[in-house]
Amino acid sequence: MVYIYKKTIGNNSYYYLRASVRKNSKTITKDIAYLGDDINKVKKKIQELPAKYTKEIRKAYRTINRFIEANHYLDKIKSMKIKKNNYLTREILENIEACRLHWNKVFLKSDEKTKQEIFMNFLIEFAFNTTSIEGNTIKLAEARKLLTENLTPKNKTLREIYDLKNTQKVFFDFINNPEKKLNHELIRKTHDELLKGIDERKGYRKQDVRVFKMNFKSTPAPYVLADMNLLIKWYNQNQNKLHPLVLAGLFHHKFEKIHPFMDGNGRTGRMLMNHILMSMGYPLLVIKSRQRQDYIRKLNKADNNTENYKELVEFMAKEMTESYWNIFL
């Protein structure tokens, strides 16, 4: 396989087309062409390479194109002033802002049909992962057929099917109404719609709850409304103070710590986190189910000490940048 390799020396970047092959259980890499030091000219340089590389380049087109676009927007951001952040390093901030720049300058300006197709691709990834984190056994390919063709997977419970279909409905409602204000009504409605046909206990819980396999104490039932009032107040006070990803990540953690509902807190929290991002001009993110243990560990560490928020926010940033260039390009 071939891919682009970036070598950084000081403040300068140099690009190479690199080939990787497995031989006798070992991976051998070799630089086969120097592509220059300007990411904006790399695409042209690749087109000028000898025909013997065409087949391999075509096979790796998406990987190569992803690299070029991501680094093109990263270079644009590097030339701009970025406000220092206590939770994110400059490198991580630059990667987030590169996604934001492409989101606003390219993706959101695409024609409606293209946007809807890409949003559907995102929804499939998001719905599969957010429900899988909670134990849904529907596979990605099955989720795709269910959400795009309404083909019900065999031997799956109605709960699992509703789980995905409800996520689809709520997601597109947010996409079509990004200006919705974050308040008690929106939070309750988001939860109730996500749990429709799954758990009919609506509204904030009136009973104490223990979180299965999670070692933390949620807000006692009599204080849920008071803590949710404080959370919404905190959100409103910090909306223009914190970086949107930091705001969304910290809101998510605080929400999960309160655990305001009897069930569906994780799914609701991840949906609200994406609503916060999009309402503030930032792209959406997918927390992958394969990262479940790391994700829960980061949430738990922040429970014990808010100084660990940095680890949680950096985790969210990594999930955003990875999912963005894989889906929205």
Residue spans for each PLM region:
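FIC/Doc superfamily catalytic core
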Residues: 1-263, 268-329
